[in-house]
Amino acid sequence: MVSEAIAALKEREGSSEFAIGKKKE
């Protein structure tokens, strides 16, 4: 369960970083 939460957090961080990067461009 803990590893699943960490994986979800990492996915959210990655997608938010990707969105910010796209907005900057």
Curated annotation (Swiss-Prot):
Basic and acidic residues compositional bias, start-end: 9-25
UniProt-annotated stretches for the region Disordered: 1-25
S-S bonds: none
GO molecular function: DNA binding
Domain of life: Eukaryota
A Pfam family of this chain: Linker_histone
InterPro entries, per the entry: Histone_H1/H5_H15 (IPR005818), WH-like_DNA-bd_sf (IPR036388)
Domain H15: 1-25
Gene3D superfamilies per the UniProt record, alphabetical: Winged helix-like DNA-binding domain superfamily/Winged helix DNA-binding domain
Gene Ontology annotations for the cellular component aspect, listed alphabetically: nucleosome; nucleus
Keyword Nucleus among UniProt keywords: yes
GO process annotations (BP): nucleosome assembly
Keyword DNA-binding (UniProt): yes
Primary localization: nucleus
Locations listed in the record: Nucleus; Chromosome
Keywords: Chromosome, DNA-binding, Nucleus
Job description of the protein: Histones H1 are necessary for the condensation of nucleosome chains into higher-order structures.
Name of the protein in question: Histone H1.1
Species this protein is from: Triticum aestivum
Upper lineage: Eukaryota, Viridiplantae, Streptophyta, Embryophyta, Tracheophyta
